[in-house]
Design a protein with these regions (language model features):
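Canonical Radical SAM [4Fe-4S] cluster-binding loop centered on the CxxxCxxC motif
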Residues: 48-86
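Short cysteine-rich clusters marking metal-coordination/redox-active sites
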Residues: 68, 320-323, 344-347
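Conserved AdoMet/S-adenosylmethionine-binding subsite of the radical SAM
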Residues: 94-103, 108-271
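Flexible, acidic/Gly-rich N-terminal and inter-domain linker regions that tether
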Residues: 1-54, 306
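Short, intrinsically disordered terminal segments enriched in charged and Pro/Gly residues
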Residues: 307-317, 331-335, 354-373
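Radical SAM enzyme core and accessory elements
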Residues: 1-13, 270, 280-307
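Cys/His-rich microdomains that often coordinate metals
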Residues: 68, 75, 327-329, 351-353
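Residues immediately within or flanking Cys/His clusters that coordinate Zn2+
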Residues: 61, 65, 286, 315-317, ...
């Protein structure tokens, strides 16, 4: 029954994705640009290995509002969350092309745990009567949204979890990834320890290698010290060192040399930590880590379009109703959000917000239990 249901999905599904407007291919992968029914765009990458294994990197948001300094997607700002259909339709598209689906990673555009629809998508992707994927064939990569990690542990404990680490100290990571002010390294790693304890599953740590930023011997020693604070669960942590993929909108960031990456890796390995240097695919078509930016024009016009997108952004302030502190949000003028979860960086209170035309309003204030925390 399940194969028949999946065949019906493949043949008869009315995709929420309005159109495939661009496809680029290299030796081992395809990058597809989709335009949604409202004109927003997302990118999806399919990796096709010689052994016959097909893996797909899908997006959970159009754009991203977290502003990581090395990421092309972050320069666009958050446009909106994808619906559950828009998430799963990225997979249906490849199914309609006759591709088998062996594994899926939420490593495309956006932060998965900032979109509640991701958990609905996990339900559909793992439901036997729908896509029928094993939880272990799915990976979610996060910048460290603690409530999302905790929910994944409870509801989908066998889904693979990857944490975008990228720096050995809070001070450095805050300059690269502002989310660190809300969820510092110690809090996230404590939460990952709990995940390992409850699931007995390996956690992957991603570390992008940036020349003269986070790649020195001292940084490697700091990283070793950080991870040994979690020595009890260290055997189930695995560190991936990722050669940085430079883009036209992140030109201030430069990749570390291969020699430097190998030296960094040697220090980590000699400390007894599981580590490897990740092989990268797709940098020639801007489909590798950190390169997805929803571009759709010729390469000559890509920089012009990205600058236009940046000019359509605004930084707006949200006042926490509990502690009265202000949080700065980067949004686009066409951003529309309903019931978007947000945590106050200072008091950790959770609220739901609505965003429309640069106007932010709180539609659900923290309850008494949340405030007491």
């Amino acid at each position: 029954a399940a194969p028949a249901a999946r065949a019906a999905l493949r043949e008869e599904a009315n995709l929420a994705l309005a159109a495939m407007i661009q496809e680029k291919a290299s030796d081992t992968l395809d990058k597809v640009l989709f335009e949604l029914s409202d004109g927003n765009r997302v990118e999806t990458v399919g990796l096709f290995y010689k052994e016959g294994w097909n893996s797909f990197c899908i997006s959970s948001q159009s754009g991203c509002g977290f502003g990581c300094k090395f990421c092309a997607t972050g320069t666009l700002g958050l446009r909106r969350n994808l619906t559950v259909d828009e998430i799963t339709d990225q997979i249906l598209y490849f199914m309609q092309q006759g591709c088998s689906i062996n594994s899926i990673s939420f490593m495309g555009m956006g932060e998965p745990f900032a979109n509640p629809q991701v958990f609905e998508a996990l339900h559909d992707l793992t439901a036997p009567e729908l896509f029928g994927l094993s939880q272990r064939r799915i990976t979610i990569s996060t910048i460290g949204i603690v409530p999302g990690i905790q929910k994944l542990t409870r509801e989908y404990p066998q889904v693979n979890l990857a944490y975008s680490l990228h720096a050995p100290t809070d001070r450095l990571r805050e300059t690269l990834m502002p989310i660190t002010k809300t969820y510092p390294l110690g809090q996230v790693l404590d939460t990952l320890d709990q995940h390992i304890r409850q699931t007995n599953r390996k956690v992957f740590l991603a570390y992008i290698m940036l020349k003269d930023v986070n790649d020195s011997d001292r940084h490697a020693e700091q990283l070793t010290k950080l991870l040994f604070k979690h020595k009890k669960y260290l055997p189930l942590y695995h560190l991936d060192l990722i050669p940085y993929n430079q883009t036209t909108v992140t030109e201030t960031m430069v990749p570390s040399s291969h020699t430097r990456i190998k030296a960094f890796c040697r220090i980590i390995h000699n400390a007894g930590i599981s580590v490897n240097i990740r092989t990268q695919f797709g940098s020639d078509i801007n489909a590798a880590c950190g390169q997805l930016a929803g571009a759709y024009r010729d390469d000559q016009k890509q920089g012009e379009r990205t600058m236009s997108a940046i000019q359509e952004q605004s930084f707006e302030w949200l006042l926490c109703p509990v502690c009265k502190s202000k949080t700065r949000l980067k949004i686009r003028k066409d951003t529309i959000l309903d019931n978007f979860p947000l945590f106050c960086p200072k008091c950790k209170s959770e609220m739901l917000i609505c965003v429309k035309q640069f106007h932010i309003s709180i539609i659900k204030e923290p309850d008494a239990q949340t405030q007491s925390r």
